[in-house]
């Protein structure tokens, strides 16, 4: 018997057997052990979830703003009370160190839910005077039933990023977590019900993206899809959504983000920022600053500081509190990252440190890849052009500000960017020219609930978090009122 046993779908406020009874395994990437069996949804299950959501959504939307706010706040309290329990599940499912999941994953997800719970009473329309006898007023009404499709790197946080604004606006959601990391989304569903969310308002369907995800994007009963994943999958989502019922779509599709270090930067601080921008969560963060641009004159000194810091990384069992670098999320993903590393070697980049999978001792049965740093990289190399989503840093040298801005923007992605400098005039001047939706100056990675998150170019459509996201889960109804007589031309 696996640690977490058989995991059912969550439909209409209860854990429910799938129609087919088919299952797939959840695997701990730290040791290869099966930790749960998850039921796989099919078309009938999708229809059941949509029907339940359509029944529950009007009940939820009819509640007062304060009633809905109190229910979501209760869910926040439960999440925080169970932080350690949920963190342990997340660590077993993703391989992320417990030191991360305890302090970041559940905490930041709960923060987003609390933020939107507080905004519910502020969701209001407008009154627009036309003339003495007439005016217009607007109402922000829910879209109805919406779908969220999550990625595998921040399972619970992403489930909350998608469900919090959707529920706050009065919608019902059907959420499909990544088939690689599904466990905490199922836990979240139970927490919402325990907090008082009406049956059918939050449903979880586990299974593959090619099947369940596609069914959700094509389903005529769904009004909006919020998707996090890769570009190729995102294009399919958009095509399916447009080809079915012209659904609204929000997508976050990853990046190949530049981190620019200027000559006046504190080099120790710059090295610390580069480490966090590349090796946090074993490099499995969509906003990672994997293209690190350094002035040619400082390149050798910067490389030395990076190598010193990489050697201090504590790689090990993610359940060990001392570990700050765990395995990749799956063995399949480990192999993908290793192919990129091999590509970097073949194309002539200089390997400073790492560049291999860890296969000895206690790490032998896990999906571990050593933190890897390449230097003397060229802009046309595969490791510089493509998103690796692993612990691989590419160091590139440059000569001038104009040159580095041009090269930083020379990518199909546009999710994030950052600069490290003591010259604030330069910082703002450069940031204003970088083609990225999320930018940091002298820091990296923090994303508060108030901060809109999303990309330029192929990195996405729309935004998550912030006030505007709540508005995008509503539709505006305009009503004109005439207080005097009506004159007809007939």
From Swiss-Prot:
Pfam families: Aldedh (PF00171). Keywords: Metal-binding, NAD, NADP, Oxidation, Oxidoreductase, Potassium. K(+) 2 binds at residues 246, 457, 460. GO terms for biological process: glycine betaine biosynthetic process from choline. NAD(+) binds at residues 150-152, 176-179, 230-233, 254, 286, 387. The active site is at 162 (charge relay system), 252 (proton acceptor), 286 (nucleophile), 464 (charge relay system). The record marks 248 as: Seems to be a necessary countercharge to the potassium cations. Pathway: Amine and polyamine biosynthesis; betaine biosynthesis via choline pathway; betaine from betaine aldehyde: step 1/1. InterPro entries: Ald_DH/histidinol_DH (IPR016161), Ald_DH_C (IPR016163), Ald_DH_CS_CYS (IPR016160), Ald_DH_CS_GLU (IPR029510), Ald_DH_N (IPR016162), Aldehyde_DH_dom (IPR015590), BADH (IPR011264). Its EC number is 1.2.1.8. GO terms for molecular function: betaine-aldehyde dehydrogenase (NAD+) activity; metal ion binding. Binds 2 potassium ions per subunit. HAMAP family: BADH. Belongs to the aldehyde dehydrogenase family. Dimer of dimers. Involved in the biosynthesis of the osmoprotectant glycine betaine. Catalyzes the irreversible oxidation of betaine aldehyde to the corresponding acid. NCBIfam families: BADH (TIGR01804), PRK13252.1 (NF009725). PANTHER family: ALDEHYDE DEHYDROGENASE-RELATED. This is Betaine aldehyde dehydrogenase.
